[in-house]
Amino acid sequence: MRPAYERLATLDDLLRRAAELSAKTLIFDVEPLVAHWESGQAALDQGVTSVLDRARAIPGVAVVCFSTNSARRPTVPLVGDGVRAEYVALAGKPLRTGYYQGFPRPGAVIGDQLATDGALARRLGYAFLQYHPDPSSLPLGPRMMDWAGQVARPLLFARPH
């Protein structure tokens, strides 16, 4: 059976759905949900802190992991307060999965790209909650990747809800 797939437009909706799925592990793609691609260090630090605070409030969540294929790293400490908090830079999504293998199940990957985040979710057997903001707000590269991912979506996931 294929993992769950849903396309949602806001962080509130993504977190609500993760709670409904009783996910114990949440893996967040960093750009653009946590911090926009062109944002600076302060935006990354603030985004990681804010998303971690909100995600750890979901009952049953044991791990919150931020994962990006870029080299960006937060300068603030990840304070999980009872939740394991991790940050993986240069993650090599979707090819490298070893880092996530010990995380508790069920889990959800939350990100914007089917080709990287969605494929990672599929490889891990996790749900994929696709962050889908207004396409006009996306730079050309991510917009084109989104289009290509939608073409490949039927190969990775069942129909979206």
Language-model regions: role of each:
Residues 29:
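Active-site residues of response regulator receiver
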